[in-house]
């Protein structure tokens, strides 16, 4: 079968189809030039080529192939802090919104055969990640199943990779930083007796991305329209080198009643950002 982006029946990521399935009336009202613009900014053809060219690969093999195709290299510091055995939350800042997740999975899949990554439900459409990704925002009748699956995974021997901020970093007052780290990973670490391994990624998106996010916030627009540009930001990173640092294990018993779970989450966030100092230069 022809897997070229031009073959409509072979499309894996299809802006028009998503619009029609999510909001048919809106899809009819949106002019074709807007549809074509959306296709360009999400790099629909590039993404479909990456997926179709590696259609037979899954999980770790697929990730390695994507990184190779995009000529992404990365250096790891503090690799000795990655435990040999046990059950952990590996948590990190989220500066890039795409490639950092791929690098996170690629590195940890070299150490563990059972990694799991809770992600936005939309990413579940990429079947090449089906053995790693877990949906976190299912709605309606599927929500209970998703919650049950998450709890079963937290209770299992799988290693959990997690971006506690949820969204990628934003630029405020001239500084690029994660948004608030959600407290759920602290609560689940305590509940399931999972130690936490903090990590830190180097990297940044374009000024355009940060300025758009700030403008959207200033105008009071709730929809994260800047997220549409994350695929473009990812392809801008081609041939780049990324640094990843792992810190020392934080025992789950650390999270006592001296702080609230939300305060402990911000404490771990601070430990993550302290790791930047371990990157040479």
Predicted regions and their residues:
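Membrane-anchoring hydrophobic helices of lipid-metabolizing enzymes
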Residues: 1-91, 101-103, 110-112, 130
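Non-catalytic C-terminal accessory region of glycerolipid acyltransferases
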Residues: 2, 11, 15, 146-281
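Short, flexible loop segments at the rims of nucleotide/cofactor-binding pockets, characterized by
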Residues: 52, 65-71, 136-142, 174-175
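Short gly/ser/thr-rich secondary-structure transition/capping motifs
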Residues: 70-76, 142-144, 226-228
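Short, basic, glycine/proline-bearing loop/turn elements
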Residues: 91, 129-138, 165-173
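Active-site pocket-lining segments that scaffold enzyme catalytic pockets across diverse folds
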Residues: 94
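Glycine-rich, phosphate-binding/catalytic loops in enzymes
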Residues: 106-109, 178-180
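Conserved nucleotide-cofactor-binding alpha/beta core module
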Residues: 109, 113-155
């Amino acid at each position: 079968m022809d897997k070229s982006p031009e073959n409509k029946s072979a499309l894996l990521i299809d802006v028009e189809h998503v619009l029609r399935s999510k909001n048919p009336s809106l899809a009819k009202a949106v002019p074709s030039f807007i549809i074509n613009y959306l296709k360009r900014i999400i790099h629909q053809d590039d993404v479909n080529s990456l997926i179709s060219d590696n259609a037979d690969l899954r999980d770790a093999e697929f990730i390695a192939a994507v990184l190779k195709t995009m000529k992404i290299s990365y250096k790891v510091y503090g690799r000795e802090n990655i435990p040999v055995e046990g059950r952990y939350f590996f948590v990190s800042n989220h500066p890039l919104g795409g490639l950092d997740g791929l690098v996170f999975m690629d590195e940890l899949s070299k150490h563990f055969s059972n990694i799991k990554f809770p992600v936005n439900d939309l990413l579940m459409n990429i079947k090449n990640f089906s053995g790693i990704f877990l949906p976190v925002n299912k709605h309606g009748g599927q929500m209970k199943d998703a919650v049950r699956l998450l709890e079963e995974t937290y209770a299992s021997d799988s290693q959990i990779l997690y971006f506690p901020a949820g969204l990628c970093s934003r630029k405020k007052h001239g500084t690029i930083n994660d948004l608030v780290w959600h407290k759920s990973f602290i609560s689940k670490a305590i509940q399931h007796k999972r130690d936490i391994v903090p990590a830190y990624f180097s990297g940044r998106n374009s000024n355009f991305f940060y300025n758009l996010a700030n403008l959207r916030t200033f105008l009071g627009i709730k929809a994260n329209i800047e997220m549409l540009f994350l695929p473009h930001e990812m392809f801008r990173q081609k041939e780049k080198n990324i640094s990843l640092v792992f810190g020392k294990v934080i025992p789950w018993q650390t999270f006592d009643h001296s702080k609230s779970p939300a305060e402990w989450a911000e404490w771990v966030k601070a430990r993550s950002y302290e790791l930047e100092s371990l990157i040479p230069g």
